[in-house]
Design a protein with these regions (language model features):
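Conserved N-terminal segment of class I S-adenosyl-L-methionine
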Residues: 1-121, 125, 129, 142, ...
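Short conserved AdoMet
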Residues: 74, 136, 150
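A short His-aromatic
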Residues: 130-134
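A short glycine-rich, Lys/Arg-flanked "PGG" loop and its adjoining helix->strand segment in the class I
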Residues: 139-151
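Short, glycine-/aromatic-enriched active-site segment of Class I SAM-dependent methyltransferases
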Residues: 158-180
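A C-terminal cap/extension of S-adenosyl-L-methionine-dependent methyltransferases
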Residues: 170, 202-267
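Short alpha-helix
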Residues: 181-197
Length: 267
């Protein structure tokens, strides 16, 4: 799988300082929750086809540190949820969020590339948010991710679009964060899945704009940086308001904050 550009120590230094995120709530229709609502719509499309018996319908989140999504997948789709992460701090925080939401789930402390054998070829669904783009060999990382899927299982890979405007801003405002990513466009992400032996069902840019994906922790320490951060968030919110009044703002290579890939394991 190769080495990650982002170390465990880097992530834990961030997580110790930040408040736990609230669990994802698709019933909050406020504008600040717009990106969650977009992802909720995506997942309802992807998982609507799930027709397995309840005792076989399970989901694994890769890189589940302080996951706000595990309770969502349990409550909204009835998945038996499991998470895996290599950070003790991140795993403990994920367990805390599950407990706060009253959701049963398993969180395993392990590296994705050397996971316990009982987790392999086990899951009907696998998801990851911002994981595979940290590895130089994307196809090898995806091959390790796909090893958790049962034959016929579905995997959803979400990464930030570091090839577009968001990536350029991150490079300018926080080069040290940008350098932790391998910039991948939709074509490269699709190809990496195919090389990893997965069948791609869809691979595309997702959401028109969301500057909230930027990591601006360093510049927020200054008044100017805080002002810029708030201005960028206001611009994002303005585009979401336009979309709510039926102005069509399609996802695209330049402005979209995410690239998503939905794939399946055929054998």
């Amino acid at each position: 799988m190769g080495d990650s550009r982002a170390s465990k120590e880097y992530w834990e230094s961030l997580w110790r300082e930040e408040k736990l995120p609230p669990a994802v709530n698709p019933r909050d229709h406020s504008l600040k929750n717009e990106v969650v609502l977009k992802f909720d719509s995506l997942f309802r499309q992807v998982f609507a086809a799930e027709r397995r018996p309840p005792d076989e319908t399970n989901l694994l989140e890769l890189g589940c540190a302080r996951s706000a999504w595990l309770p969502y997948f349990s409550k909204e789709f009835g998945f038996c949820v499991t998470g895996i992460d290599y950070s003790p701090v991140g795993c403990d925080q994920a367990r805390t969020i599950l407990a706060m939401e009253g959701v049963e789930g398993n969180v395993t402390l392990a590296d994705i590339s050397s996971a316990p054998q009982h987790l392999l070829n086990r899951f009907s669904s696998v998801v990851s948010f911002g994981v595979v783009e940290h590895f130089e060999a994307t196809d090898e990382a995806l091959r390790s991710c796909g090893a958790f899927l049962k034959p016929g299982g579905t995997m959803v890979t979400v990464i930030p679009n570091m090839n577009g405007f968001v990536g350029r801003l991150q490079k300018w405002l926080g080069r040290e964060v940008y350098d932790l990513h391998v910039p991948l466009d939709a074509k490269a992400l699709r190809r990496a899945h195919e090389v990893a032996g997965l069948e791609v069902l869809r691979c595309e840019y997702f959401c028109f704009l969301n500057f909230g994906v930027l990591n601006l922790n360093r510049i927020r320490q200054s008044f100017l940086g805080l002002w810029l951060s708030r201005a960028l968030n206001a611009i994002s919110a303005a585009t979401w308001m336009l979309e709510r009044i039926r102005v069509r703002l399609p996802a695209n290579r330049m402005t979209s904050p995410y690239v998503i890939c939905v794939s399946t394991k055929t054998t």
